[in-house]
């Protein structure tokens, strides 16, 4: 080997080896400090790509597990609302069973129907207001896809159905609808009439008031029997007193001499009393609200059928000398029953279609019966259990004020009782049960999906760890080796750097 000064080959070789051991030491320290075998693509290009795909799957599956838990929450929210709907349906069914019992009065049936209506409205409220994260879960049909995988198409569908009164087939559910009219139902109270028709029974004439718009003449109220009957055999009217030949005449108080008598009586009470005093007249207690002068003018009020009625007496001079029917004015449509003299009024039903006034079946026999009221001919069948008008079956309905009225089958269709109420409720319960069962099954499916996702994430983490995580035993060994090589290399480099000094010995 030539003895040279300019190039120290041994030193260069030692430096190169020292750099290699330095690189190994740096790599080992980096892996030990990060815990990763692959800290950059240069550490393992293929391994880095594989580990990165595992990371994508792990993150996607972890989020999918959270999505599945959200799916369980949606199903639980919906099922909870359906449970409350089910409770309301069970109560409606219980009430329907009660309503089908023949011992119920009209008042009982109305109370039952009122509660049923409230329960049905609550079902609609629950349907409309139940939501999860702003999504209404029962107000419309909807298929909600829940992503339960890390890739496209990996979903579970929650089938949400619209559940309300209409979708359950309970729209118009009624256990207290109008019933078919019978001859015995052809009656209404005096308070519903303003006009009259005239009927002949033998040589006698009977007037029965209906809403005909005819002017009621100022006639003295006659003495009448308690009831007027329609004979099922021939449709003729008769009274319960065969020898009574007095005409039946119903009248409005302010258009008759009876109204004059009432005006005088009320004016006299006002004249003899003071504001705030009370007095009784024909079974009704009146209060003097206003007294004008000393001639009997003023206002009195009372409560009839649950509403306040004010009667005004005006334009009286010189005592009660000029009192007549027109003197007494009412804030409501006040009528007087010619049977018992009691005051009645009804503001809502006075303009309804023609009604028979206080007619009652009596001794129904074979044969079809007919009666004409204000030009409308009502026909009762031979048994008296069905009444028709213009070929359409008539039904008895009750107004909001409790007055029985006649309506035809077209109007009754919208109000009629549900044909098979218990079957309708059972059908609704079955639909709710089916939806609840579906939601229960989907919750179990989500539970299974979450378990599987957890297992998959665990296995993928293990696989990724084997690729990119550092083996500390190996790396510590590599670091120790590199450290020793560094120490040795440094020492040898010092020796190599001294080799050129040997050339000086040749110059001595």
UniProtKB/Swiss-Prot annotation:
Write out the entry's keywords from A to Z.
Bacterial flagellum, Secreted
Q: What is its main location?
A: secreted
> Which segments does the entry list as coiled coil?
none
Keyword check for Secreted? yes
- Give the family per the record: Belongs to the bacterial flagellin family.
PANTHER family the UniProt entry points to: FLAGELLIN
Add the further remark from the entry.
Individual Salmonella serotypes usually alternate between the production of 2 antigenic forms of flagella, termed phase 1 and phase 2, each specified by separate structural genes.
The name of this protein is: Flagellin
Q: Which organism is it from?
A: Salmonella berta
């Amino acid at each position: 080997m030539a003895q040279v000064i300019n190039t120290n080959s041994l030193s260069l070789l030692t430096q190169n080896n020292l750099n290699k051991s330095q690189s190994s030491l740096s790599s080992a320290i980096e892996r030990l400090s990060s815990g990763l075998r692959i800290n950059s693509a240069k550490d393992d290009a293929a391994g880095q790509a594989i580990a990165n795909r595992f990371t994508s799957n792990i993150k996607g599956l972890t989020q999918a597990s959270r999505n599945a838990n959200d799916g369980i929450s949606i199903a639980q929210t919906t099922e909870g609302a359906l449970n409350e709907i089910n409770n309301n349906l069970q109560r409606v069914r219980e009430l329907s069973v009660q309503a089908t019992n023949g011992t119920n009065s009209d008042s009982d049936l109305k109370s039952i129907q009122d509660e049923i209506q409230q329960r049905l409205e609550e079902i609609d409220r629950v349907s409309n207001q139940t939501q999860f994260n702003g999504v209404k879960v029962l107000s419309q049909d909807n298929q909600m896809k829940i992503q339960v995988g890390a890739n496209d198409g990996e979903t579970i569908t929650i089938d949400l159905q619209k559940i309300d009164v209409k979708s359950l087939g309970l729209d118009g559910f009624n256990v207290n609808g109008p019933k078919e009219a019978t001859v015995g139902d052809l009656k209404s109270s005096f308070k519903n009439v303003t006009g009259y028709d005239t009927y002949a029974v033998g040589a006698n004439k009977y007037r029965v008031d209906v809403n005909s718009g005819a002017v009621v003449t100022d006639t003295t109220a006659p003495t009448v029997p308690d009831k007027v009957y329609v004979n099922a055999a021939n449709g003729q009217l008769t009274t319960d007193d065969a020898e009574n030949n007095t005409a039946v005449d119903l009248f409005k108080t302010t258009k008759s001499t009876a109204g004059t008598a009432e005006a005088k009586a009320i004016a006299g009470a006002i004249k003899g009393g003071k504001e705030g005093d009370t007095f009784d007249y024909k079974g009704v207690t009146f209060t003097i609200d206003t007294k004008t002068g000393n001639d009997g003018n003023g206002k009195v009020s009372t409560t009839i059928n649950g509403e306040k009625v004010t009667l005004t007496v005006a334009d009286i001079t010189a005592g009660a000398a000029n009192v007549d029917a027109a003197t007494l004015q009412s804030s409501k449509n006040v009528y007087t029953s010619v049977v018992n003299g009691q005051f009645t009024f009804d503001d809502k039903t006075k303009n309804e279609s023609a009604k028979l006034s206080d007619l009652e079946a009596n001794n129904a026999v074979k044969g079809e019966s007919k009666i004409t009221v204000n030009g409308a001919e009502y026909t009762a069948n031979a048994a008296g259990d069905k009444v028709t008008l213009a070929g359409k079956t008539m039904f008895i309905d009750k107004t909001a004020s409790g007055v029985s009225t006649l309506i035809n089958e077209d109007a009754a269709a919208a109000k009629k009782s549900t044909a098979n109420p218990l079957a309708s409720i059972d059908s609704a319960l079955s639909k709710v049960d089916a939806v609840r069962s579906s939601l229960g099954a989907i919750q179990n499916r989500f539970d299974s999906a979450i378990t599987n996702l957890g297992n998959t994430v665990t296995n993928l983490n293990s696989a990724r760890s084997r690729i990119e995580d550092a083996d500390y035993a190996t790396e510590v060994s590599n670091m120790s080796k590199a450290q020793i090589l560094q120490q040795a290399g440094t020492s040898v480099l010092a020796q190599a750097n001294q080799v050129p000094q040997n050339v000086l010995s040749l110059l001595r």
